[in-house]
Amino acid sequence: VFGASDENGNDIHLKKDDTLDEESYKIDIAENIVISAADDLGFVYALLKISEKYLDIKPFWFWFDQKIEKKDSVKIEKCEINSPKPKVKYRGWFFNDEVLMMKWKINGDKKEPWRMAFETLLRCGGNMTIPGTDKNSRLNRQMAADMGLWITHHHAEPLGAEIFARAYPGVEANFMEKSELFYKLWEDAVIEQKDCNVVWNLCFRGQGDCPFWSNDTSGQFDTPQKRGKLISNIIKKQCDIVKKYVKNPVFCTNLYGEIMELYKDGYIEIDDGIIKVKADNGYGKMVTRRRDNHTARVSSMPVKDGGRQGIYYHVSFYDLQAAN
């Protein structure tokens, strides 16, 4: 029994056990409840397991308007509960095009909807999030990290940095002429996040989620070879910037849209240690999404592709033709 009743109740003890795998837990229920875990997320998952199994709090309780009844006590049989082993190391949600979240307040608190979203992710066994797009990602980043989540970034936001056009208003986003300004943006972003758990997104795309050559007026990137070479060199530079501040960093790159097309044709070089994240087209088909009048439909499934792999699967996006 545990609760606020007059019955003799259990205490919940937390026991750090370095022999357990990361994020795993063991719950021993006897005279007391002993939760063993190797790290913070292991303890979080265990407490949420108790919440669901014995207090009947559903993972989506907030979003489903679950009516929660107060209980004086809960009786639990003696048992042992061991955590399931996740098949994917980094698992999470990307909160994108989040217009319905941006002005929502709960009891006057703009942070509470995001807090509930991150809690739900944890209750579902997730451990990573892109905590919004553009400004929202930076507003919500620390809260997500404080709740134990890994942070990663929008595929058009290298290392989670500020958008060039906002950081340098009136300055053309021309990498060949303004490379030092880009480097400063990226370095500032790394310094800002270096104390969080981050899967660092490596990329170079244009302003506002488009190919970088759409914003470039130099005329130097008129072939896929030139475009791929620049992106490859920038990815290496971004890795070097992160390694200045972070020990054993985790890297990913999103092979999305025009980036997948260049990669498939062999124009972009990516080290095997970088997680290559492949995307569906918005309809569940693993091909590149359509944009404007461009319908390449390049397969995004790995073919003899070495190294670490990931998937970016859309739930409420239907490509950039239907979206228009």
Predicted regions, residues:
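Contiguous, structured surface segment used for ligand recognition
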Residues: V1-K85
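Hydrophobic or amphipathic alpha-helical targeting/insertion segments
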Residues: E31-D65, N136-A161, A167-E192
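An acidic- and aromatic-residue-enriched active-site/binding cleft used to recognize and process polar
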Residues: A38-D40, E98, G126, T133-N136, ...
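An acidic-aromatic substrate-binding cleft motif
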Residues: K58-M128, G307-G310
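Gly/Pro-rich turn-and-neighbor structural signature
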Residues: I68-I76, R141-D146, A173-G306, L320
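Active-site-adjacent "gating/activation" loops or surface patches in catalytic cores
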Residues: V88-W93, D97-K111, V277, G284-N324
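Hydrophobic faces of well-ordered beta-strands that scaffold small-molecule active sites
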Residues: R91-F95, L122, M128-P131, I151-H154, ...
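Catalytic domains of carbohydrate-active enzymes, especially glycoside hydrolases
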Residues: D109-L139, M143-T152, D195
